[in-house]
A protein has these predicted regions:
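Short catalytic/ligand-binding loop motif for oxyanion handling, primarily in non-cytosolic enzymes
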Residues: 3-4, 46-50, 110-113, 131
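Active-site metal-binding loops of divalent metal-dependent hydrolases
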Residues: 1, 43, 105-107, 126-127
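Binuclear metal-dependent phosphoesterase catalytic core
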Residues: 80, 88-96, 108-178
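His/acidic metal-ligating clusters that form di-metal
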Residues: 5-105
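A residue-identity detector for tryptophan
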Residues: 1, 53, 138-140
Length: 178
């Protein structure tokens, strides 16, 4: 699965899944409409791995359930380093219909965004300095992902490279007063 590399990344545990399921059901029932949510995690779910390879194996073409939005797959070989264990978290999100996007990192050179089964799956830019030798000098994968949430529950995202010494930002730097 991972080109000979054994993945030992921990999967999300059952208590998290139960808590998510139990918290969203009453919230969704209160107003008789689905409460929209976003999920933020560090290690991508196994479905990110599956969706990515489905996209690649389909000649990098969209399918009915899978849409490429933007970004690059900068990691070599294994590309998506997820847990091998299917936690059922993604299936719960699809079933509840409330989680519209999930955001994760972990794979420092990836910044691609896919939509899979109605959920946006999104790598952010890397903000570290020690993951790989000289990563602080590369620049292209450094920055942030802007998430703009709208009052109707929809959202939009964009990646911005804030590597100030090398690239011009899209917007002026904000003055910070302390």
């Amino acid at each position: 699965w991972y080109s000979g590399v054994v993945s030992t990344y921990s999967a999300y545990n059952k208590s998290l899944l139960s808590a998510m399921d139990e918290a969203e059901k009453p919230a969704n029932a209160e107003d008789f409409e689905t409460v929209k949510s976003l999920l933020f995690i560090h290690i991508p779910l196994v479905e990110v791995h599956d969706a990515y390879w489905e996209y690649v194996n389909n000649g990098r073409q969209n399918t009915e359930e899978l849409k490429y939005i933007r970004g690059n797959d900068g990691e070599s070989d294994r590309v998506v380093c997820s847990s091998k264990q299917d936690t059922m978290l993604f299936e719960i999100m699809v079933q509840l219909g409330s989680t519209k996007g999930m955001f994760y990192g972990h794979d420092h050179l990836n910044n691609f965004v896919l939509e899979y089964k109605g959920i946006q799956m999104s790598y952010g830019y890397s903000i570290d300095y020690f993951a790989y030798a000289d990563i602080d000098k590369w620049g292209y994968q450094r920055g942030c992902q802007m998430i703009i949430c709208h009052s109707d529950g929809s959202f939009e995202t964009r990646h911005e490279n804030y590597y100030q010494d090398k690239y011009q930002p899209l917007y002026e730097k904000e003055a910070v007063k302390m």
